[in-house]
From Swiss-Prot:
This is HEAT repeat-containing taxis protein OE_2401F. InterPro entries: ARM-like, ARM-type_fold, Armadillo, PBS_lyase_HEAT. Involved in taxis signal transduction. Essential for the ability to control the direction of flagellar rotation. May have a role between CheY and the flagellum. Interacts with chemotaxis (Che) proteins.
Length: 406
């Protein structure tokens, strides 16, 4: 049987369903349910397996199945698993009223499901009954899901109640409250999150740090920079992600000063996890502005020899990027790092057949900033060999900077 990690990557619904139904380990069944909830296409048999798992002997598996069905927005299936019917009315507010009533159910699973669906529906008027439920609910699993729902409804009026949940509550409730505060992004929410960035729990610090990245202001930057020195690699990486996110969202008049502050502090850390996180954002990020900022930063915080080669390799692979700014930032980043390693890496782009004309042109540009005699000689040959006007233009310009004949 493949590992759960492998199944998560492959999205093998059949194998996940088999684990959910037949594994003797509740941790495996729970994780299988979570993975099914995250799939783009869980298929009908995956949904049905989650419905069946709502009757699992283990409470954590039942809760995971409820969350997974909510993640898939499979409200009909969710209610079927609880022997309930979805309200016939097509109006969202009418459905919401019915689920608010379910918050009073004696069955914890139904209260969990009700909270989840209310978060999914996002009806503002349900924030008040959810907040009331959070203050009176005794079941930890239900409390956690109510806190989550309040964040998804995004009503600032509930900020104070969520801040109160950051302290003196079970960890799962505290983390859901922290994540919800990141959605609200009020001043009170910010103050609350800043109060737990040094929490004893690694998981709590990581959640708080991640939530701070949602604020479109420079205020969390100092706290996030401090977390670059956290003892936990996961917290440090979350801090990098949040700093990039803030940098991508702050007003332009604050951007330059912030960049310099963040670069100075990241460079001082010389931490491999920072480089790894930046490369991950570049490789896997879905937002262009995040990838641009991470590329720009990578060349300026490359650090010592332990991390420098990873940064050089990542930037080299971006020289032919379709986005002109990313390609430009990659070239200037390599120039910022400088040295023989960068020159050798750039010459490989010019000398092999693995790279397209755009990458070769940007490599020639960068060689004009970091190259020596061997680069000048290779660029002079490139001028004669290439059929690309852009490559020739970049090579000519680089040769002139290196003191060669043009």
């Amino acid at each position: 049987m493949p590992s759960l990690y492998g199944l998560e990557r492959s999205g093998d619904v059949e194998k996940l369903v088999e684990l959910l139904q037949e594994s003797e380990k509740e941790t495996v069944r729970r994780r299988a349910a979570e993975i099914l909830g995250n799939l783009d296409e869980p298929e009908p048999e995956g949904i049905q397996a989650l419905v069946d798992a709502m009757s699992d002997d283990d409470e954590s598996v039942r809760a995971a199945a409820i969350d997974a069905l909510t993640q898939q927005e499979a409200v009909d299936a969710l209610m079927r698993g609880l022997d309930q019917e979805v309200p016939d009315s097509g109006a969202t507010w009418a459905q919401a009223e019915a689920f608010v009533e379910n918050l009073e159910s004696e069955t914890p699973e139904l209260r969990m499901a009700a909270a989840n669906v209310l978060g999914l529906l996002g009806v503002e008027d349900t924030a008040r009954p959810l907040a009331k439920q959070l203050q009176t609910e005794e079941h930890v699993g239900v409390r956690a899901r109510v806190a989550r729902a309040l964040g998804r409804i995004e009503q600032p009026a509930v900020t104070g109640i969520l801040v109160d949940c950051l302290h003196g509550e079970p960890l799962k409730v505290r983390r859901e409250a922290a994540e919800s505060l990141g959605r609200l992004t009020t001043e009170q929410a910010l103050d609350g999150l800043l109060s737990v960035v040094e929490d004893d729990s690694e998981a709590m610090r990581r959640t708080a740090v991640s939530s701070l990245g949602r604020f479109e202001t420079a205020e969390p930057v100092d706290a996030l920079v401090e977390r670059l020195g956290d003892e936990s690699d996961l917290v440090r990486r979350a801090a990098v992600f949040s700093l990039i996110e803030i940098l991508s969202n702050v007003p332009p008049d604050q951007s330059h000063e912030l960049r310099e502050t963040i670069v100075d502090r990241m460079s001082a850390r010389s931490d491999p996890s920072i480089i790894k996180s930046l490369i991950e954002i570049i490789d896997e990020g879905t937002q262009l502005h995040q990838r641009r900022n991470a590329t720009w930063m990578l060349g300026r915080v490359a650090g010592d020899q332990r991390t420098k080669m990873d940064a050089i390799e990542a930037l080299r692979e971006l020289l032919g990027e379709d986005d002109d700014l990313i390609a430009q930032f990659a070239a200037t980043g390599l120039a910022e790092i400088g040295g023989a390693s960068v020159e050798t890496s750039l010459l490989e782009v010019v000398e092999t057949q693995e790279y397209g004309e755009d990458a070769v042109a940007m490599a020639a540009f960068a060689l004009g900033k970091v190259g020596g005699d061997r680069s000048r000689q290779r660029l002079e040959r490139l001028v004669d060999e290439t059929d690309s006007e852009e490559v020739r233009r970049r090579a000519f310009s680089a040769i002139s900077k290196l003191g060669g004949k043009t």
